[in-house]
């Protein structure tokens, strides 16, 4: 059995000088699953599980980064996450890793309690959310991404058919660069309000009737959907840039209809 000699000092290999003199733009840990809580608009905290990617810039003369410190950072920071806490976490990582630049990204399921439109029955609906922060040259950029499932109904199908119209589930994905706090619910509502109809986790028959008729009265091509959401994002002063995607999982085809709008308000 091995026994540690009290006088023995373990070598710190990753802190030695690297003679190849090649900097590494991003080095760290990826796909770390770790519990977290997310601050909600009413001030409460929602528990969930995050998948984390954390990395830093490594100077040319340093052999390796301190890999264990990334996970230690998550263990030490368990306060509910919002944009200000996320910025503080990014700053703490740079200090802990002694790095000039770095990036943190976390993805997690986020649940919203929704009320059915007619019966009033309540149920949870899940959304895929990501927060990403990038810090370099003394500046920090923060991004909020959310995937919102909705319903779309085809205007052409409605126009040419004597009854009915093909409809399908669609995904609206908003990846917004923020200059001010934006609750994730705000982006969710924008996408849902501009779709043919939103989704609920639980519906009774009167609700199904409402959803069917609502979508029929509000038909949209994928082009309509992405443009209508883009108009809302253009008018939001808290968002400085965005990448917006809409994908319709066509019910009459074995392929999707797809549209993307990218915008950076700083370039206007």
Swiss-Prot record:
Domain of life: Bacteria
Catalytic activities: GTP + H2O = 7,8-dihydroneopterin 3'-triphosphate + formate + H(+)
Protein family membership: Belongs to the GTP cyclohydrolase IV family.
EC number: 3.5.4.16
Site annotation May be catalytically important: residues: 154
Name of the protein: GTP cyclohydrolase FolE2
Any single Pfam family the record assigns to this protein: GCHY-1
Protein's pathway: Cofactor biosynthesis; 7,8-dihydroneopterin triphosphate biosynthesis; 7,8-dihydroneopterin triphosphate from GTP: step 1/1
Keyword set, alphabetical order: Hydrolase
Enzyme class per UniProt: hydrolase
GO molecular function: GTP cyclohydrolase I activity
Organism name: Paraburkholderia phymatum (strain DSM 17167 / CIP 108236 / LMG 21445 / STM815)
Main function: Converts GTP to 7,8-dihydroneopterin triphosphate.
HAMAP family linked to this entry: GTP_cyclohydrol_B
Disulfide links within the chain: none
GO biological process: tetrahydrofolate biosynthetic process
């Amino acid at each position: 059995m091995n026994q540690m000699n009290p006088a023995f000092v373990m070598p710190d290999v990753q802190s030695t000088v690297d003679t190849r003199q090649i900097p590494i733009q991003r080095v760290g840990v990826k796909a770390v699953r770790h519990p977290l809580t997310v601050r909600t608009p009413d001030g409460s905290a929602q528990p969930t599980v995050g998948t984390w990617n954390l990395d830093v810039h490594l100077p040319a003369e340093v052999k390796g980064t301190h890999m264990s410190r990334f996970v230690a950072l998550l263990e030490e920071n368990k306060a509910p996450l919002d944009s200000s806490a996320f910025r503080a976490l990014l700053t703490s990582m740079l200090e802990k890793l002694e790095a000039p630049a770095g990036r943190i990204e976390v993805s997690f399921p986020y649940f919203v309690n929704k009320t059915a439109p007619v019966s009033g029955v309540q149920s949870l609906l899940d959304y895929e959310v990501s927060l990403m922060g990038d810090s370099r040259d003394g500046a920090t950029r923060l991004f909020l991404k959310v995937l919102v499932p909705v319903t779309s109904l085809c205007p052409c199908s409605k126009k040419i058919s004597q009854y009915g119209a093909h409809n399908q589930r669609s995904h609206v994905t908003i990846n917004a660069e923020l200059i001010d706090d934006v609750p994730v619910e705000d982006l969710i509502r924008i996408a849902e309000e501009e779709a043919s109809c939103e989704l609920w986790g639980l519906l009774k028959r009167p609700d199904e009737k409402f959803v069917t008729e609502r979508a029929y009265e509000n038909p949209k091509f994928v082009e309509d959907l992405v443009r209508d959401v883009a108009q809302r994002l253009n008018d939001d002063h808290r968002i400085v840039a965005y990448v917006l995607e809409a994908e319709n999982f066509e019910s009459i085809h074995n392929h999707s209809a797809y549209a993307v709008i990218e915008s950076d308000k700083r370039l206007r």
